[in-house]
Amino acid sequence: MKSSEIRQAFLNYFVQRGHQLVASSSLIPSNDPTLLFTNAGMVQFKDLFLGLETRPYQRAVTAQRCVRAGGKHNDLENVGYTARHHTFFEMLGNFSFGDYFKREAIQYAWEFLTEVLHIPAERLWVTVYKEDLEAEGIWLKEMKVSPERFSRCGEKDNFWSMGDTGPCGPCTEIFYDHGPEVAGGPPGSPDEDGDRYIEIWNLVFMQFNRDREGCLHPLPKPSVDTGMGLERLAAVIQGVHSNYEIDSFQYLIKAIAQLGQDIDLNHTSLKVIADHIRSCSFLIVDGVLPSNEGRGYVLRRIIRRAVRHGNKLGLPSPFFFKLVQPLIDVMGDAYPELINSKAHIERILQQEENQFTRTLEQGLRLLQDHIKNLKGQELSGEVAFKLYDTYGFPIDLTADIIREQGLHIDMEAFNQLMQQQREQSQAASQFTTDYHAVSQLDHQSEFHGYEKESMEAKIIGLLQEGNEVKSLNKGAKGAVILDHTPFYAESGGQVGDKGLLIGKEFSFQVDDTQKVGQAVVHYGEVIKGELTLDLSIHAQVDHIRRDAIRLNHTATHLLHAALKQIVGQHVQQRGSLVDAERARFDFSHFEPLTPQQIQQIEEVVNAQIRANNEVITQVMDIESAKQSGAVALFGEKYSDAVRVLSMGDFSKELCGGTHARRTGDIGLFKIVAEYGIASGIRRVEMVTGRYALAWVNEQLGFMNNLAATLKTTPNSLQEKVSQLLLDNKNQEKMIAKLLSEKAQKSGADILGEIEEIKGINLLIKQLEGMDSQTMRHTMDQLKSRIDSAVIILFTIEQNKMNVIAGVSKNIIGKTPNAAQLVRHLCGKGGGRDDMAQGGGDVPEDLNSKIKEIKEMIEKN
């Protein structure tokens, strides 16, 4: 069976047994900030297991894409060197959320392996937690597993927990026996670390909750979480020992080898590259782009490791991007997102390889030079840090290279240098805390801003300098918390509302609104009277400002959809700031937008504005929202109930902000700036409505003023400027010609002043009223006409001298070089050995300096 057939057989088996087929979640966990990448099938169900989420099914089956590289789960350094380490793998899993438990889970696993895949029972080995008598009884008495192929293990191997506290439980594992020809003993034995018995399926039974004292309490609804690596299972079914020998890997390995010449198909570098094209491609599909921090840096490390191994194989660069199509050949049917993102993946990989190739050779030469001069087995941390800091070598790449030569790195010194760099960076980015900062509050406010812009409310909390107080007097800056509010608290990129809180004897100007816990906090200043707890107030949002914000926020949704349409489906929102006067939108893309693309985007958005579609908001559960095609923002955490914003069939996104009622309310949309803010991240700044009209009028004003200055009309402005540029170019040519003629004449006039010293023709000459450009022309003329020449030309004006020196290439090394001559004469300057310039104050002993130069030449 092919790997793809095994995957499908697994999914079909459990779907037929009442399991909901759930698509693989993103490699970027949306519900666990502690995880760098999704590394197991249960990650997307974590909140279900914790009881924080409900779904319309109690059984699920998945083929989950996983990455283990960086962070706690880092297999990178072993990838390619062992039979089963990967940065990317597929985890097959079936799950029960309070439905079936141990008996059914064990029955399903055994039946699938022995009856569907026809693995002989005598080649399987089972382990259980030593205290789990229930699972032991099911295996031995009901499944009739031989006691000779069964073992009990301790908590370290067969008891799983989510953390120090929380859900946990025993697990049972199924191993495949590769036969006596492979070294190693059964699980639980002293020789268990060998490769004979390989774990293929782990069944976790979550039946307890561990408290802070370590006591176990039975869960009201025990659950099942299982995981089986597709690559390991395919190796078993296909009768091979290494995962790299299975069909999908062999296809990639052969494709890589075809890019080079006479490459041994067992070469470790082929395995490294085959693994890395999988993880890199899927990370890019899920929105990760190479960068110098976080997930982006892990991706960069993997790409650079692959490029280094390609260099080792002698593959012509760039090569890595050419492997996307072979990957699609073996995985595109299961993951069509690969096909849809092919061009984007190729572009990113090619761009990153080209960027790294420029420094790879230099870094490798530096490293090899240091290795040759090593007196021991340890490379200094300073060299490793220089490779990282100057040549872009991730530390694990350097470790990879020197490990191949039996060496290691002084990691302590490297880490110290890294820490110093981090501290310097942190010191350079210190910031001050806002006066109204507050970390947590117990109050709770109810938001009514979707329906209202003003309402009656009661003060339930007052803050000053971050502390709760009982009153705020006139002139005091602080914050007010209300039981009900129409004020929108800053969230999702939309700024907080401004406005007034008004009473009979007081008023409070709201300058900002933030959310702290469940409380909506109104920051500002008391402009009349005194505020105390329990006062009734009238809350009034600045509706003109709110309306402008609404237009901008709705426009960002139209912009997002237009970017995907014009630039590509790889575009993902990476941030935004929606204010009243303008908005900015950050998105993933690898190069600047062209003027043509910007124009197309504006045309698409303005067409949607003219369509005047109704902006429809629906509240639904997160799963239904995603199934409806709503776009969820990259890395955003959503609650069970979400707001889905639709504008015709052009845009549908999850969003909690305030919006226009119809797209036509926006009026006009203009992009005013586009630029990069980080590697792979672009930013668009835009204006809408009356601010867009004001911007257009301002640009027209500039154009009219410029036309008046140039004595033409706005319609003829481009033609006029083109003619001016052409005239300027012709005048520059004329000036250059005159300068050349002047230089030739000056050069000819002073040829008679050459002084010969030991076969070297020395010419030192002060020129009158000559600019730097003419001096350079004169120098070029003289050097072309004088052999074995040392030429120094200088001008003096207002006690400042400008110096240029030239040395014929055939005498470099036999005389002071040009830069040394310039510095000797005027103290400052630099350039090449054969040509240099400088300037400074005229030395008091100028004649002595000239005499010393002659003496220096005589000594050489």
From Swiss-Prot:
Q: What intrachain disulfides are recorded?
A: none
Q: What is its EC number?
A: 6.1.1.7
Q: Known catalysed reaction(s)?
A: tRNA(Ala) + L-alanine + ATP = L-alanyl-tRNA(Ala) + AMP + diphosphate
**Which Pfam families has this protein been placed in?**
DHHA1, tRNA-synt_2c, tRNA_SAD
Task: Name the SUPFAM superfamilies on file.
Answer: Class II aaRS and biotin synthetases (SSF55681), Putative anticodon-binding domain of alanyl-tRNA synthetase (AlaRS) (SSF101353), ThrRS/AlaRS common domain (SSF55186), Translation proteins (SSF50447)
Question: Which top-level enzyme class is recorded in the Swiss-Prot or TrEMBL entry?
Answer: ligase
Keyword Manganese listed? The answer is no
Task: Please share the entry's free-text remark on the cofactor.
Answer: Binds 1 zinc ion per subunit.
Instruction: Summarize where Zn(2+) binds, as residue positions.
Output: 553, 557, 655, 659
- SMART domains registered for this protein in UniProt: tRNA_SAD
* First-listed, main subcellular location of the protein, grouped into a coarse class: cytoplasm
Q: Does the keyword Transmembrane helix apply?
A: no
Q: Name its cellular compartments.
A: Cytoplasm
State the UniProt keywords alphabetically: Aminoacyl-tRNA synthetase, ATP-binding, Cytoplasm, Ligase, Metal-binding, Nucleotide-binding, Protein biosynthesis, RNA-binding, tRNA-binding, Zinc
Q: Which GO terms describe its biological process?
A: alanyl-tRNA aminoacylation; negative regulation of DNA-templated transcription
Q: Which cofactor does it need?
A: Zn(2+)
InterPro entries tied to this protein: aa-tRNA-synth_II/BPL/LPL (IPR045864), Ala-tRNA-lgiase_IIc (IPR002318), Ala-tRNA-ligase_IIc_anticod-bd (IPR018162), Ala-tRNA-synth_IIc_core (IPR018165), Ala-tRNA-synth_IIc_N (IPR018164), Ala-tRNA_ligase (IPR050058), Ala_tRNA_ligase_euk/bac (IPR023033), DHHA1_dom (IPR003156)
**One annotated Gene Ontology cellular component of this protein:** cytosol
Annotated Gene Ontology MF terms?
alanine-tRNA ligase activity; aminoacyl-tRNA deacylase activity; ATP binding; tRNA binding; zinc ion binding
Q: Which domain of life is it from?
A: Bacteria
Q: What is known of its domains?
A: Consists of three domains; the N-terminal catalytic domain, the editing domain and the C-terminal C-Ala domain. The editing domain removes incorrectly charged amino acids, while the C-Ala domain, along with tRNA(Ala), serves as a bridge to cooperatively bring together the editing and aminoacylation centers thus stimulating deacylation of misacylated tRNAs.
**What functional role does this protein have?**
Catalyzes the attachment of alanine to tRNA(Ala) in a two-step reaction: alanine is first activated by ATP to form Ala-AMP and then transferred to the acceptor end of tRNA(Ala). Also edits incorrectly charged Ser-tRNA(Ala) and Gly-tRNA(Ala) via its editing domain.
- Protein family: Belongs to the class-II aminoacyl-tRNA synthetase family.
Task: Indicate what this protein is called per its UniProt record.
Answer: Alanine--tRNA ligase
Native organism is: Legionella pneumophila (strain Lens)
What's the encoding gene here? alaS
